[in-house]
A protein has these predicted regions:
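Short amphipathic alpha-helix that is part of the acyltransferase structural core
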Residues: 24-64, 181
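Active-site rim helix/loop that mediates acceptor-substrate recognition in acyltransferases
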Residues: 53-82
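Conserved beta-strand in the GNAT
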Residues: 79, 85-93, 98-105
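Conserved acetyl-CoA-binding loop-helix of GNAT-fold acetyltransferases
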Residues: 106, 112-126
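Conserved GNAT acetyl-CoA-binding A-motif
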Residues: 127-148
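C-terminal "cap" of GNAT-fold acetyltransferases
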Residues: 149-150, 165-185
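Conserved acetyl-CoA-binding loop of GNAT-fold acetyltransferases
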Residues: 152-164
Length: 185
């Protein structure tokens, strides 16, 4: 890593402490994490990412996610920034020793740049005592987006998520359950 000419323009702060640096070539060094609430300043960007990331049958509006978050002590809604750019979000539910990722999305222009992997890494840091559980569209050979489903599964596997051997069906679709290592009950 090289020294930055003006680190104050590139430093990422969390509670007044520098937690990472985004260098001038826009290569990710770290992310700023914020809780998404009703006064979230980038609600339009959040909505845009949600619309781009999820097909209509899987889409849930950020306003509905906020309502659910506000009504539950076990629900968290996180936003991620690279520098000043809002790049993605996670919506999750905590239950016993498990965190279930309900929604995870990264903006189209930030995909395949390492941001998704960094967010998953930070998720494990946020919840070190929890097993992270998520579901993905099953790699059904007859699916019209089979290539996308395989790429998504491979992405999670590269990031340490393993198949549990369990599947869940909702919204008329079948999803494969993955978890962050270890056994799954």
């Amino acid at each position: 890593m090289h020294l930055l000419e003006n680190p104050s323009d590139n430093a990422i702060f969390m509670s007044g402490i520098v937690v990472g640096i985004v260098d001038k070539t826009n290569i990710l060094m770290s992310l700023k994490i914020v809780r998404i609430t009703r006064d979230f300043p980038d609600m339009n960007a959040l909505e845009q990412i949600a619309v781009e990331a999820f097909p209509p049958q899987e889409y849930v509006s950020p306003q509905d996610l906020l309502s659910y978050t506000e009504s539950s002590d076990d629900c968290d809604f996180w936003g991620f920034y690279a520098g000043k750019d809002f790049i993605g979000y996670l919506h999750l539910i905590r239950y016993k020793n498990m965190v279930y990722v309900c929604f995870f999305a990264v903006g189209v222009s930030y995909r395949s740049c390492g941001y998704g992997s960094e967010i998953l890494s930070r998720l494990k840091e946020l919840y070190p005592a929890y097993q992270i559980v998520l579901d993905i569209e099953a790699a059904d050979e007859s699916a019209p987006n089979l290539v996308q489903r395989i790429r998504r599964r491979d992405f999670y596997r590269r990031n340490g998520y393993v198949p549990t051997g369990h599947y869940i069906a909702y919204w008329g679709m079948t999803f494969e359950i993955l978890c962050s290592g270890g056994g799954f009950d």
